[in-house]
Amino acid sequence: MSVAELKERHMAATQTVNDLREKLKQKRLQLLDTDVSGYAKRQGKSPVTFGPTDLVCCRILQGHTGKVYSLDWTPEKNRIVSASQDGRLIVWNALTSQKTHAIKLPCAWVMTCAFSPSGQSVACGGLDSACSIFNLNSPIDKDGIHPVSRMLSGHKGYVSSCQYVPDEDTHLITSSGDQTCVLWDITTGLRTSVFGGEFQSGHTADVLSVSISSSNPKLFVSGSCDTTARLWDTRVASRAQRTFHGHESDVNTVKFFPDGNRFGTGSDDGSCRLFDIRTGHQLQVYNQPHGDGDIPHVTSMAFSISGRLLFVGYSNGDCYVWDTLLAKVVLNLGSVQNSHEGRISCLGLSADGSALCTGSWDTNLKIWAFGGHRSVV
């Protein structure tokens, strides 16, 4: 069989798969008689309301000289680590806005960072295809450089996301442009498991984000440029447990719902979606109508501790607060006083849910606190 014939058969098979996938999508829509917001409205649920003082900017963290790409909170809620295009990690005291550490990175092209559960170490990764671990208690050398305590090497593409396994300083999961996710043993620096790659159930394009379930740390989800999200069990690396379809473009961010039974996704198609890991069904779409202009991409997301609110960052500088039950925007932090002046690249909620931190291409981070009559939701 010639190369041309093989190519023709491959194109025909691809078209068949796409046609079947579309039929499956339409059948699911027929069987799914309602979504979360439709059910909530029929039950007479009232929307969450926000006043002008219910979520206010209380701190501006200034110190980076380049675009902020990633941030993470410590479990004890009073420190934040941020990664920037300026090639530095900065650890901040969220209560005083003071810097406690400024770490110059061996590779300036950093894309992600994470705090260890104990708060004693930070991890970062980027275009060097490695994940670097820094012990914050290690002394700096004579040149003022903070030494790398462990280098996790093995990916064949950039490291797009990293997250420590909850309650463990010894294990971490990374996602990469090589279409895989990896579970690492930080103590040895070795890969424990590789998810995807040569396995047929893996992603078929760059993996951009991972999120580990806090209720079951053996489960994590990944989002990819192949427009899908996949559920993995760290005990079974050979195949994804489920594949979730619905987005029409890159899935930039994934985040588990607080109960661990659902997760959210955000995409370049401008929408966020809520999926159930037990049934595989899409429960809700969070999407603002736009005109004929460019649709802002979803860059980052976080749920409130109850799951009633969804905080979403967008490429145009907007930061919507969604009512997850009624699928309505209750506040746009991009239109209030002290809003960012550039793309919202990352955001995260403190462990107790009392504060939100946003990072932007305007080089700043901002901490937003609940005030007025609004308690933590």
Curated annotation (Swiss-Prot):
Summary of the function given for this chain in its UniProt record: Guanine nucleotide-binding proteins (G proteins) are involved as a modulator or transducer in various transmembrane signaling systems. The beta and gamma chains are required for the GTPase activity, for replacement of GDP by GTP, and for G protein-effector interaction.
Keyword presence, Cell membrane: no
GO biological process: G protein-coupled receptor signaling pathway
Organism annotation: Solanum tuberosum
Residues in WD repeats: 63-93, 105-135, 154-185, 202-233, 246-276, 293-323, 339-369
Database matches in PANTHER family: GUANINE NUCLEOTIDE-BINDING PROTEIN BETA G PROTEIN BETA
Pfam family, one: WD40_Gbeta
Biological classification of the source: Eukaryota, Viridiplantae, Streptophyta, Embryophyta, Tracheophyta
Coiled coil: none
Subunit: G proteins are composed of 3 units, alpha, beta and gamma.
Record-linked InterPro entries: G-protein_beta_WD-40_rep, Gprotein_B, Guanine_nucleotide-bd_bsu, WD40/YVTN_repeat-like_dom_sf, WD40_repeat_CS, WD40_repeat_dom_sf, WD40_rpt
Highest rank taxon of the organism: Eukaryota
Protein name: Guanine nucleotide-binding protein subunit beta
Stated family: Belongs to the WD repeat G protein beta family.
Transmembrane residue ranges: none
Alphabetized Gene3D superfamilies for the sequence: YVTN repeat-like/Quinoprotein amine dehydrogenase
An annotated Gene Ontology molecular function: signaling receptor complex adaptor activity
Name of the gene encoding the protein in the UniProt record: GB1
